């Protein structure tokens, strides 16, 4: 069922919005109605309590969070109380999402400012700045000289900002933190790292900073709420709005420290599994791949804008290259690639062209998976299984990224196992099954980084630093002996094969104080974060010296001058490989070799694995003992077509696969 929305128009909408009249008027001129999630979120946010918003893609979550913050800043400007200080901190797990949010904020800020000027109010500009690893040094320096009112960053850059001396001072005035796509970081070490950084922000400001979490897919939602607010034993208010509800009253606000706005994750979706003409096997043949490229190209031509997701950067380059060959008749540069090993310039260009419709199709990895505005994409293709239910929902939700739209997704199976997995995924999505999020308990490597960073900025009482760490939800059960052991290791140094490593802390065991040694701050800034280091070589285009992207170290050292490689859907001829750098020149479309990157493919989640096992068991049950398959007449075939988005050929191949496995093994493997 689709989530229903409040239908408020004109004066009735104006009066319903809890904003300054100019801000409210801007909203009514831009939108015909406010969504249900927005009408519930705004009073909750303006109450000052922590808020977690869980809603489908395209339901207006980001605007729900930001418009209240913009209204607060605007009203300060009206009262001549707006200072040149950072009050709103927005954290997203992707640099692409950070850049996109900045662009999407510039327009409302500009239009609200123009509306104020038209009303006779000359107000200071509300400034928004992005600070990530891609931010040029000049912009970083300008930000320190004149802090933005809204700062957009990533978890890793927030850690650096908290640790560097000058930027740290800028964060003392933060009053609201917005964590977008919180489900993407909560179940891994990046989440633990961010949770500690949020507690350091709260400690730095000396006040209770309001926290707003945004996510599209979460289960259990109470765990994510606790992750957001930290270890304060919150009593969670569940403002659940079921998708089947015809209408809902605005959320009743209570005195609880965290409010959950949950309008569910289920939407009507147009889902199907695409099966190649040749019969699928254990591995994909060249003929199968060729048929997949042909079918994707045909779908691209039949739609205005298409987003193709793959699971690896190598496959992104490969698919974009072969689609380019098949779609050349549509014009030049109608296909673009997008992944984390491309330069910022190339990624931003692909994002802009996708949003404006300048390209017909973009082939991407997880780099475009989260809430970036992808414009009017009306089809998402997934090559192979996305390996998790949440990822499948998130990626397919990129299509129809506007209110009331029905996302359209096509999953392309490349093997028999992927056929079953894709069918199980569609069945799970239709049934409302979600992956379960589990927060990793107290990763000590992350704890050590944050202790060094915190001690590098000021002297700490041991007990106070221990309490700060335990306020972060992943460390709520951290015992004192473990904390002391980590501190001792950092203060005494640790033994390696080359001898004892350097110590980062001064530990006063008499007065129980901790402070950083010389070099601790630099070590924290240069070595912090939970994203694994990779030995990549920068790819530099000559003669202008433009950075095109990066390739894996092993690929770089195996390459020779004169080789042609593909990066960003462009052929490059290698001129030379040096220390950490690969110099290239435009190869003018010559046939290329596709680079590889190590350690890319995602693992399958436990929930999707359970759905795969359940589907196999259900097919076996419907076949009946000893029943043979003949010309698609087996009972499960029609059931698979209705339940799992398979066509006749795909359903028949799925049944044949189960029968063949049972004939060899004597039983259908399940999790029982």
Language-model-detected regions and their locations in the chain:
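Detector for the N-terminal beta1/A-loop initiation region of ABC nucleotide-binding domains
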Residues: 30
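Walker A (P-loop) phosphate-binding loop of ABC-type ATPase nucleotide-binding domains
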Residues: 56
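Cysteine-centered motifs
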Residues: 2-3, 8, 243
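Terminal, basic amphipathic appendages of nucleotide-handling enzymes
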Residues: 431, 577-671
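Phosphate-interacting basic helix/loop segments used at nucleotide- and nucleic-acid interfaces
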Residues: 290-295, 299, 354-355, 359-361, ...
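ATP-binding Walker
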Residues: 59-60
């Amino acid at each position: 069922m689709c989530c229903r929305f409040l239908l408020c128009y004109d004066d009735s909408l104006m009066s319903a919005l809890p904003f300054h009249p100019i801000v409210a008027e801007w909203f009514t001129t831009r939108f015909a109605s406010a969504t249900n999630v927005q009408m519930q979120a705004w009073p909750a946010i303006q109450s000052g309590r922590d808020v977690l918003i869980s809603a489908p893609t395209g339901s207006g979550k980001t605007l729900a969070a930001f418009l209240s913050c913009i209204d607060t800043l605007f009203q300060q400007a009206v009262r001549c109380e707006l200072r040149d200080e950072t009050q709103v901190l927005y954290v997203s797990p992707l640099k692409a999402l950070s850049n996109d949010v900045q662009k999407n904020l510039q327009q409302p800020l500009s239009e609200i400012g123009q509306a104020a000027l038209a009303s006779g109010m000359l107000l200071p500009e509300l400034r928004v700045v992005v600070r990530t690893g891609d931010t040029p040094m000049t912009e970083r320096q300008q930000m320190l000289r004149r802090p933005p009112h809204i700062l957009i960053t990533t978890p890793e850059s927030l850690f650096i900002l908290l640790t560097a001396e000058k930027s740290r001072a800028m964060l003392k005035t933060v009053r609201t933190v917005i964590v977008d796509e919180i489900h993407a970081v909560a179940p891994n070490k990046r989440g633990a790292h961010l949770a500690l950084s949020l507690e350091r922000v709260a400690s730095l400001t000396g006040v209770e900073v309001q926290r707003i979490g945004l996510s599209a897919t979460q289960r259990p939602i109470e765990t994510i709420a606790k992750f957001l607010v930290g270890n304060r034993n919150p009593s969670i208010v569940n403002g659940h709005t079921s998708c089947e509800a015809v209408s809902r009253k605005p959320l009743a606000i209570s005195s609880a420290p965290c409010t959950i706005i949950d309008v569910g994750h289920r939407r009507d979706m147009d889902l199907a599994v695409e099966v190649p003409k040749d019969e699928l096997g254990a591995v994909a043949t060249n003929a199968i791949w060729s048929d997949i490229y042909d079918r994707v190209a045909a779908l691209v031509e039949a739609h205005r804008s298409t987003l193709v997701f793959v699971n690896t950067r190598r496959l992104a380059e490969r698919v974009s290259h072969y689609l380019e060959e098949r779609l050349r008749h549509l014009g030049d540069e109608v296909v673009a690639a997008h992944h984390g090993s491309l330069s910022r310039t190339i990624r931003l260009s692909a994002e802009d062209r996708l949003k404006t419709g300048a390209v017909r199709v973009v082939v991407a990895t997880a780099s475009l998976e989260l809430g970036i505005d992808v414009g009017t994409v009306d089809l998402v293709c997934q090559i192979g299984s996305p390996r998790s239910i949440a990822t499948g929902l998130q990626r397919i939700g990129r299509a129809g990224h506007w209110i009331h739209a029905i996302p359209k997704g096509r999953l392309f199976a490349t093997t028999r196992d992927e056929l079953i997995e894709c069918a199980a995924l569609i069945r799970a999505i239709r049934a409302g099954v979600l992956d379960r999020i589990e927060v990793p308990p107290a990763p000590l490597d992350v704890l050590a980084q944050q202790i060094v960073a915190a001690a590098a900025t000021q002297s700490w009482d041991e007990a106070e630093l221990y309490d700060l760490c335990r306020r972060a939800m992943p460390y709520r059960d951290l015992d004192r002996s473990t904390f002391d052991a980590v501190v001792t290791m950092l203060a005494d140094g640790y033994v390696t094969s080359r001898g004892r490593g350097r110590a980062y802390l001064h530990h006063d065991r008499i007065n129980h104080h901790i402070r950083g040694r010389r070099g601790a701050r630099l070590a924290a800034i240069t070595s912090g974060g939970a994203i694994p280091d990779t030995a990549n070589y920068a790819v530099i285009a000559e003669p202008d010296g433009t950075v095109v992207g990066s390739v894996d170290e092993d690929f770089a050292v195996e390459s020779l001058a004169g080789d042609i490689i593909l990066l960003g859907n462009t052929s490059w001829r290698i001129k030379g490989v040096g220390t950490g750098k690969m110099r290239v020149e435009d190869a003018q479309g010559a046939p290329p070799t596709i680079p590889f990157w190590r350690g890319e493919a995602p693992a399958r989640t436990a929930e999707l694995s359970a759905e795969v096992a359940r589907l196999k068991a259900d097919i076996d049950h419907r076949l009946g003992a000893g029943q043979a398959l003949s010309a698609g007449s087996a009972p499960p075939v029609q059931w698979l077509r209705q339940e799992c988005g398979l066509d006749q050929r795909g359903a028949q191949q799925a049944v044949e696969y189960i029968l063949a496995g049972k004939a060899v093994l004597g039983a259908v493997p399940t999790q029982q």
